[in-house]
Amino acid sequence: MGHVLSFTHCKDAPSTASSTPDSCPLEGEDDDTPVTEVDFWPLPSPHEPTFSYITIGSSAPLSRPPVRARRGLGQGRVHEAPREETEEKEVKDVVNYVLLENTCELKQISPLQVQEEVVFVAKPQPQVEVFRAVKDLLYWRDTLLSTGCLTGVTLSLLCLSQFSVISVFAYGCLIILSVTLTLRLYTKLLHALKRGNGANPFQYYLDTDLKLTTKQAEEIVARAFSLASTTLCTLRSLFLVEELKDSLKFLVIVYLLTYVGAVFNGITVLLLCVIGAFTFPILYKQHQTQVDHYVSLVSKKVNAFRSKFQGAAKKPPAKQK
């Protein structure tokens, strides 16, 4: 809230204290005539002590201070404005006060309505979920699950190296069915003895939704066709020597694979890859600083040797005398 207080000089008044805030009658005159609210606010003369008190920001409208009659020695009368210009100026001031009141009026702000925020969480893509599951498996986030997967895959590959695929599939199915049937019969027996509810111990896995929607199936098929077409195009460019440098690199790699095939078969190589996939990530995570240091040293040596070899190849041959 703001306050404005202004005074004007009055040389005829004996003191600044007055019972009325807006007028000083002339000498020998008494102001006994009552003034109604319809009349304008009496205008001060240049020689009267006046003051104006304005309050800004009040919620109630500005009201004009009441004018009381001043009693004196002589007969009272209302002091009239000597000029019409002063009267018009006072009207403009009153209008300005009203406009100022409307502008500075404080309006009560309605309380904020607290609304529940609805957050739409996008459903993760199947590829992202699979990648996250494989990463957790290789980094041994769940020790029991990682141990079971490594043991199962290793035993399967060892069996495939000694027996046929059909025999391994048949014996594997028999082992799994023997375990699940034993657990199911055990729960049925407990229910018959009233020591259990007889629920299926594999109900959680039975309730898991494994169905693919049409959109997901289309995405998987499109991704598979894209990968197959890219592989075929790459092999075509390598075998038909589209780029001589790439074809020579492919020739060296295939020649080295002949030596690998002479020592190991496909199952053994696959078994080594599985063991390395479950071993190297966790070892790198535990000794990351040392591994990065040695890798940087090896890369510097290789880059130095490559730059030296390229410099020798670009050097022009010496002229024969």
From Swiss-Prot:
Compartmental location: Endoplasmic reticulum membrane; Sarcoplasmic reticulum membrane; Cell membrane; Cell membrane, Sarcolemma
Residue segments, region Disordered: 1-32, 65-86
Superkingdom in the source lineage: Eukaryota
Extent of the signal sequence: none
Main location: endoplasmic reticulum
Biased amino acid composition, Basic and acidic residues: 77-86
Keywords from the UniProt entry: Cell membrane, Cytoplasm, Cytoskeleton, Endoplasmic reticulum, Membrane, Sarcoplasmic reticulum, Transmembrane, Transmembrane helix
Residues passing through the membrane, by range: 163-183, 263-283
InterPro entries with a match to the protein in the record: Reticulon, RTN1-4
Pfam families assigned to the protein according to its UniProt record, in alphabetical order: Reticulon
GO annotations of cellular component type: endoplasmic reticulum; endoplasmic reticulum membrane; intermediate filament; membrane; neuron projection; postsynaptic density; sarcoplasmic reticulum membrane; T-tubule
One biological process term in Gene Ontology: endoplasmic reticulum tubular network formation
Tissue: Isoform B is expressed in the anterior structure at the mid-neurula stage, localizing to the neural plate and eye anlagen by the late neurula stage through till the early tail bud stage. In stage 25 embryos, expressed in the head and neural tissues. Expression is restricted to specific regions of the brain during the tadpole stages. Isoform C is expressed in the paraxial mesoderm at the mid-neurula stage, with expression shifting posteriorly as the neural fold closes. At later stages, expressed in the myotome of the somite and in specific regions of the brain.
Domain Reticulon: 134-321
Record membrane topology: Multi-pass membrane protein
Function: Inhibits amyloid precursor protein processing, probably by blocking BACE1 activity. Enhances trafficking of the glutamate transporter SLC1A1/EAAC1 from the endoplasmic reticulum to the cell surface. Plays a role in the translocation of SLC2A4/GLUT4 from intracellular membranes to the cell membrane which facilitates the uptake of glucose into the cell.
Protein name: Reticulon-2
